[in-house]
Every structure is written in structure tokens, then in C-alpha cells.
């Protein structure tokens, strides 16, 4: 009898909480801090409850340290294309952190210049950022800042990733010819082909975060991009051959200590096949990627074991294709951010935040958030919350950029959100 009473009380509390959360269309107006998407039945909450514009990280960059998520915030509202480095009105951008248990927000950086970084090391509780030729680390617990290195004039470049134990940063050297092309042809539709065809010499470098020593480790006459250190192996770096995806074997890895010949992760097998938007699985054993065979016709998520080379491909519907996919921390499920009608899949029904489960050689999709009021010029870039109960994404469906989380399972209504 006592156990039944407890169950009834819990049920009553759950129903009461559910009734206090409004069910409504997502976006197209100012939203409350919490609501239930009327088209999916899933609960959505706003994580960045501050003024200005707030943007979470690119899909493969880990923003989580302990109970906090690092994000970029500015004092200017702008609902346009922010992507990775910011655009639109002049703004003062700094780094912030939101506590995923309390939703309290604190400012991490307060520089006289804009700070827009996505380099976070959970192992050392540091964020790394750069201003002109100087590279800094900031401990997010005590906010102590240290200078790591000042780049020599002959070796200027940009840092983009940190290794698993926080001892190495990696980036690419600047190229004057590439800067010239970008200056003369600022539209991606113009510069993308021009830089690819130029076959400029590109160089990857590392910086030791303890000694500040900068070392060039690999050069090639190819457009090297999207550097990502393994989340578990401090010496293993992934990079891509940028360019039109159907013309490049894109995804490569190399050991930054042994400096052996880079290893190709996926080789194209047919005309107009593409593989890209690659990311590391959390265990560091697999690299995942968007795979289309051929482009715009048949859609998969590919998964390659970096040690054995064994690849598995999982098919999904055209309408379920996403600009970016991401794997859960336990790698048992996937999520995706959907796409607009003008995206690669050209699906009129693709504007959703998706949750995917494996079903043999296919992926079974669940729609979590209707994104019809979101402008996909700002890519949502999904992340799993550390407890894997929520999918975190960025959106402009209120008319300003903010960061949100949608609950994967319906009907929980737990007061302990994360």
C-alpha cells in the first residue's frame, strides 16, 4: 500500500509539472524559458538566459567541463549567419559558461578584444584562445590566465584544437595567397573552388602548452582543414583535404609524434560520392562521417575503426539527412540537426532536430524539435548533454541566437534537468 501511494504521488507531481509547461509551436515569436514542442511532444528549455547573442560550439568541438558548458556570447543581438567565427553587426564577443544543473551563467573572459574560441580541454579545465600572434590559456575554475606562446613573424597561424591531455595545440600556418583569394572573393561559392584549385602549400603546426615551443609537423600542396585531435590519444590528429567533397578523399589521420605518412580513413568508390563533416567518437576508436553515394541521392552515416580500418555504413531517409550528425557519449545513438530546403538533401521536410537509433544497417529517426521557424544560415550543430538525456543546439527561431536543449525522452519532467 505504501509503495502504491508513493507511485501515485510521483505520478501526480509529474502531471502537475507537465501541466505547468506550455505546449506550443517552437519559434516565430519570443519563447518562454521552457515549453513542449507541439509537433513532437518533447520538452525544450533555453540554456542561455542572458541578453545579446549566444552561440554554442561547432558540432565536433567539446564544450563541456565538469557541470558547465562553455559558449560564446555577445552584447549585440543578431539572428544571421554566425557559423564558427561570427558575422553581422559589430559586437563584443567573450566566452561564458552555463552550469547545466543550475543554469547559472558566468563570464569567463573579459578582454578588450573579441574572444571567439572553441578550444576546451576537459582534462585541464582550460580554454585556449589567440589574439594576433599571442596564444593564451585560461583556467575556467579560477579564471587565471597564462601566456603560452608568441608566434614568430615567419610562422603565423591559427590554433584550432587541443589534444586529450592538454599538452599540445594544433593549427595551420597562415598563407598570404589564400588571404588574397579570400579578400578578393569573400563568398564561399567563389573562394572554395579557387583555393582548392590553387594547390597552395599548407602546413600543420603544434604548440607545446607547457614550453610554448612551436613545431611544424606536416606540409602538403593540398587544402588542409578541420583539424581535430583524438579525444583519448594525445598523439593522434585527424585532418581533412578540403575542397569539393566529390573530388577529394577527405578524411585523414596522423601521429604528430611519429610523423608517419597520413592514413586515409575513407576512400571514395563511385562517381560523385562524398564523405565529410567528420568527427571522433568519444572512445577515440571510431571516426564518423556524413556519407552520400552518390551526392544528394543515397544517404548514410559512415563509421570507421581507426585501428582496424573496418567501416560500417548506416542508411537513413533523405528527409532525415542533417547538416551535421553527432554520436552519443556511449556511441549507442546519434543525433542530427536537419537541413533547410536548399541544403544538400533538398528535402522539404528536413527542418527538425533528430534523434537516431541503430536498426541493423539503417537508422531509425525520432523528431525532437520542429525547426521550421529557424534560419539554417545559422547551423544548429547538435551536442549530447553529458548525461545523454538531452540534445543541445543553437537556433535563431526567436529572432536572436540562443542555445537550447531538447529532452530525448518524453514525460520525464525531472526537476534535475541535467
Tell where the protein language model's regions lie, with residue ranges.
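Short, conserved, GDST-rich strand-edge loop motifs in beta-rich repeat architectures
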Residues: 20-27, 73-90, 171-199, 240-248, ...
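Beta-strand-rich domains and repeat architectures in extracellular enzymes and scaffolds
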Residues: 21-34, 39, 43-93, 227
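Multi-bladed beta-propeller domains
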Residues: 35-55, 98-114, 140-155, 206-223, ...
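Blade-loop segments of beta-propeller domains
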Residues: 53, 57-60, 76-132
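Hydrophobic beta-strand positions that form the internal "hydrophobic ladder"
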Residues: 69-71, 126-127, 168-169, 236-237, ...
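Asp-box/WD-like beta-propeller blade repeats and closely related beta-sheet repeat scaffolds
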Residues: 110-202, 216-219
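Loop/turn-rich, solvent-exposed surfaces of beta-rich toroidal or solenoidal domains
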Residues: 281, 285-302, 310-364
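Blade-level signature of beta-propeller repeat domains, shared across WD40, Kelch, NHL, RCC1
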Residues: 379-418
Amino acid at each position: 500500500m505504501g509503495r502504491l501511494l508513493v507511485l501515485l504521488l510521483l505520478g501526480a507531481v509529474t502531471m502537475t509539472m507537465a501541466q505547468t509547461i506550455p505546449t506550443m509551436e517552437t519559434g516565430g515569436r519570443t519563447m518562454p524559458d521552457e515549453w513542449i514542442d507541439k509537433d513532437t511532444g518533447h520538452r525544450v528549455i533555453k540554456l542561455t538566459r542572458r541578453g545579446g547573442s549566444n552561440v554554442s560550439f561547432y558540432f565536433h568541438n567539446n564544450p563541456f567541463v565538469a557541470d558547465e558548458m562553455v559558449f560564446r556570447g555577445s552584447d549585440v543581438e543578431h539572428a544571421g549567419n554566425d557559423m564558427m567565427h561570427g558575422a553581422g553587426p559589430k559586437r563584443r564577443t567573450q566566452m561564458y559558461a552555463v552550469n547545466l544543473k543550475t543554469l547559472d551563467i558566468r563570464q569567463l573572459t573579459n578582454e578588450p578584444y573579441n574572444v571567439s574560441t572553441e578550444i576546451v580541454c576537459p582534462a585541464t579545465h582550460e580554454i585556449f584562445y589567440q589574439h594576433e600572434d599571442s596564444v593564451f590559456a585560461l583556467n575556467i575554475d579560477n579564471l587565471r590566465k597564462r601566456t603560452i606562446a608568441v608566434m614568430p613573424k615567419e610562422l603565423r597561424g591559427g590554433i584550432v584544437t587541443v589534444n586529450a591531455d592538454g599538452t599540445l595545440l594544433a593549427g595551420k600556418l597562415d598563407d598570404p595567397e589564400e588571404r588574397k583569394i579570400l579578400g578578393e572573393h569573400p563568398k564561399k561559392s567563389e573562394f572554395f573552388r579557387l583555393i582548392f584549385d590553387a594547390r597552395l602549400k599548407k602546413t600543420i603546426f603544434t604548440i607545446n602548452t607547457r614550453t610554448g615551443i612551436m613545431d611544424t609537423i606536416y606540409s602538403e600542396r593540398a587544402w588542409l582543414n578541420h583539424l581535430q585531435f583524438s579525444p583519448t590519444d594525445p598523439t593522434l590528429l585527424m585532418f581533412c583535404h578540403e575542397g569539393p567533397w566529390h573530388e577529394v578523399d577527405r578524411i585523414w589521420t596522423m601521429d604528430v609524434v611519429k610523423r608517419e605518412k597520413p592514413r586515409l580513413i575513407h576512400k571514395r568508390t563511385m562517381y560523385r560520392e562524398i564523405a565529410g563533416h567528420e568527427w571522433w567518437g568519444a572512445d577515440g576508436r571510431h571516426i564518423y562521417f556524413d556519407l552520400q553515394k552518390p551526392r544528394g541521392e543515397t544517404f548514410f552515416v559512415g563509421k570507421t575503426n581507426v585501428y582496424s580500418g573496418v567501416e560500417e555504413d548506416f542508411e537513413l531517409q533523405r528527409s532525415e539527412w542533417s547538416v551535421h550528425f553527432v554520436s552519443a557519449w556511449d556511441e549507442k545513438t546519434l543525433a542530427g540537426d536537419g537541413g533547410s530546403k536548399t541544403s544538400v538533401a533538398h528535402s522539404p521536410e528536413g527542418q527538425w532536430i533528430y534523434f537516431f537509433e541503430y536498426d541493423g544497417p539503417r537508422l531509425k529517426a525520432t523528431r525532437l524539435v520542429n525547426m521550421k521557424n529557424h534560419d539554417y544560415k545559422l547551423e544548429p550543430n547538435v551536442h549530447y548533454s553529458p548525461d545523454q538525456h538531452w540534445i543541445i543546439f543553437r537556433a535563431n527561431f526567436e529572432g536572436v541566437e540562443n542555445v537550447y536543449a531538447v529532452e530525448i525522452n518524453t514525460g520525464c519532467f525531472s526537476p534535475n534537468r541535467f
